[in-house]
């Protein structure tokens, strides 16, 4: 029987700023990537999100970023590999401490935003991220864009790796995610999200924005929680996958 991990980025509120629909989306995913202070996620939010994941049986992972609260982690900051490694390690440690206090162990690490995108193509940055994960624990899985430099760096460090694809992001013909600057970069329609996900999981193919079929093997599928209608899309994905005979579960 086919199975797939369904993950979401969450815990991205901070202080008075509320971002995303965690309560609406978490019941439908199997893994959660929790912001840990770099771009969002203060200690109160982190603890609440970990508790909610524990209640729902959702696997918990860290979602570190460039130290960029003002830009929500979507800006590329000029940092050395050593600085990136230290910042990622610190964020993993912060969430791990809170999780352990709640009786939860981290399962994976997925970079956020600009750090995710740069690590997908820049082996130096990817290696810095992988070093941080390995320094914390070789048991943590490193999540990165399928067929990316980050997946390669994780393997080189001896880490378990999870190749990620997206239910709600459009792809270019070369396999890159379509830049968010374009209005068609996000897939909002739940039916379209399910169609893309089924193609990836069952056929190992995603249809690019220009109609090109692109080979894509994924261990985990991300659905974003910070866009309008996120909960409805997550529900449609979960129910649609199960109706197609595909089990939604953590990969290990």
UniProtKB/Swiss-Prot annotation:
It catalyses: 5-oxo-L-proline + ATP + 2 H2O = L-glutamate + ADP + phosphate + H(+). It holds the Pfam family LamB_YcsF. GO terms for molecular function: 5-oxoprolinase (ATP-hydrolyzing) activity; ATP binding. InterPro entries: Glyco_hydro/deAcase_b/a-brl (IPR011330), LamB/YcsF/PxpA-like (IPR005501). HAMAP family: PxpA. Forms a complex composed of PxpA, PxpB and PxpC. Belongs to the LamB/PxpA family. Its EC number is 3.5.2.9. Catalyzes the cleavage of 5-oxoproline to form L-glutamate coupled to the hydrolysis of ATP to ADP and inorganic phosphate. GO terms for biological process: carbohydrate metabolic process. Keywords: ATP-binding, Hydrolase, Nucleotide-binding. This is 5-oxoprolinase subunit A. CDD domains: LamB_YcsF_like.
